[in-house]
């Protein structure tokens, strides 16, 4: 059982996806609080926008690591979300700071429902990814010479 670069990439991805799962759960909670009018949209958007760049950087980092270690299934699974992150950040509203959530439009019914749906999809993706990376890391450790 050897500790290869691919196993190292999967180990880092497990830790990173743990943070992304936290970010996704926090986003779902914040958007649900906006939907039920428990919180101020300016404060919620400020809190959510602080998590955008760390999530995108974390996801981009382990996607690049998978490219370097040439893990095809992981690359193919992560590239659509990486391209989606690039697209949403390029099309973000004009604001003074980084982020994609605009407090003036977040309370529109369509914007709020699409944000909630995207948050749930990201949470499901990160959960499935976590268990796949766990399996792939164990498989890589067991089968490496």
From Swiss-Prot:
The keyword Phosphoprotein does not apply. Signal peptide: none annotated. This is Protein cornichon homolog 1. GO terms for cellular component: COPII-coated ER to Golgi transport vesicle; dendrite; endoplasmic reticulum; endoplasmic reticulum membrane; Golgi apparatus; neuronal cell body; perinuclear endoplasmic reticulum; synapse. It is found in: Endoplasmic reticulum membrane; Synapse; Cell projection, Dendrite. Interacts with glr-1. It is a multi-pass membrane protein. SMART domains: Cornichon. GO terms for biological process: endoplasmic reticulum to Golgi vesicle-mediated transport; negative regulation of anterograde synaptic vesicle transport; negative regulation of receptor localization to synapse; positive regulation of ERAD pathway; regulation of AMPA receptor activity; regulation of behavior; regulation of NMDA receptor activity. Widely expressed in the nervous system including in the AVA interneurons. Belongs to the cornichon family. Negatively regulates export of glr-1 from the endoplasmic reticulum to synapses. Keywords: Cell projection, Endoplasmic reticulum, Membrane, Synapse, Transmembrane, Transmembrane helix. Disruption phenotype: Hyperreversal phenotype with considerably shorter average forward time than wild-type and a corresponding increase in frequency of reversals. Increased anterograde transport of glr-1 with corresponding increases in synaptic glr-1 expression and glr-1-mediated currents. Altered pattern of glr-1 glycosylation, indicative of increased export from the endoplasmic reticulum. The chain crosses the membrane at residues 5-25, 57-77, 116-136. It comes from Caenorhabditis elegans.
